[in-house]
Amino acid sequence: MRALLLKGGRVIDPASKRNEVADVLVEDGVIRAVGANLAADGAEIYDAAGKVVVPGLIDMHTHFREPGQEAKEDFASGSRAAAAGGYTTIATMPNTRPVVDTAALVTSLQKRAEEAAVMHIRIIGAVTKNQEGKELAELGDMVEAGAVAFSDDGHFDPSAKVLLSAYDYLAPFDKAIINHEEDTSLVEEGAMNEGHRSAMLGIKGRPIVAEDIAVARDIMLAEYAGAHVHVAHISSARAVQLVREAKARGVHVTTEVTPHHLTMTEDCVDPTDSSTKVNPPLRTEKDIAAMLAGLLDGTIDMVVTDHSPHAREEKDREYIYAPSGFPGLETALGVLMTELVHTGKLPLETLIERMTYAPARIFHLDAGTLREGAPADVTVIDPDCVWTVDEKKFYTRGSHSPFVGRELRGKAVLTVVDGNIVMKDGVITI
């Protein structure tokens, strides 16, 4: 393997608190050195001057649809979309067909990922069998097989009794349960945030209290069991405060937020364009302000995409009948740089920490740092690259993004996985 020398970029490594202009030398798949005026005979030189060199981005909440719905996305297409967006590690949710609820499936999917993906894919196992909320899945066996966390994402079916049993079982393993926080009984058939906007559009709403109730319940159960609850795609101001208060009293609770929940409100909903239909739904400016404050003060630990591609014919249905979600891996960094970093709302260093070191630390991944000896997963960002989102250039099989046509500023221009360049200037190279 040829050595790679990244010269003269601004190196941001939250794990070591490094934020300075430096060189990064990659040899034999690891970070060999970080410092000034590095040299290596025969190394490939990449001029990173004016760019930002960071640990490879990590996304702990994606839906790659494999097995069972490969027409929407599979490990090959999804991993290429991830690499194009600057990601070197992602975790994929278990709501597939069949549901990932056995050790055998975890093992087979890990093997499949090694064969088909251009970056690292980690597997999240289901909490309950077939995600039906009735009987615990093979949790211990899936831990042994390598499941990185557990989730019935997309469902809020487990009763308090079943969920408490899962917390009790997983607490000794220090594995998180990632919960989709909406009380199903309150959001059935709802397609957007409940409020004045939904009433004006004539679209049945999903009340925000459904999220608040769910977050409160799951925090209390995790606190009782001494277990780790991870609140998925938080979107409510009250939920942010509940997490903040729980952390203050020592509860093992972490949480995530998506770029769309940080930058879009219910006012973006257009009944003729289902790309904005997501669960939980887009909320209000008040909620965005609370989430941004939570991101700044550490209440919200990480940013994820909830990358959820669907077939075009599915998303072209009437708003209330279209499935929820859209692809986000190729637009996330640009949206966050444009809307938060370049507007002065969020320091770049904080954003990088929430997209690299934090998820690696919380989910115990050997990733998220540029320390010497670490796996050479590196992303180079051009903070001033101005580009227009074009679905025809997506690597994902889903094209239904609300950001299509948007001009963004900031983009990953180089993605390195285990020392190999897998993306350069938007082109997958392997």
Stretches with model-predicted labels:
Residues E318-Y321, P375-I430:
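C-terminal cap of metal-dependent C-N hydrolases
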Residues G9, V24, G29, G50, ...:
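Divalent metal-coordination and catalytic microenvironments
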Residues M60-E73, T96, R122-E135, K204-I208:
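Active-site mouth loops of central-metabolism enzymes
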Residues A48-E115:
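Metal-associated gating/positioning segment near the N- to mid-region
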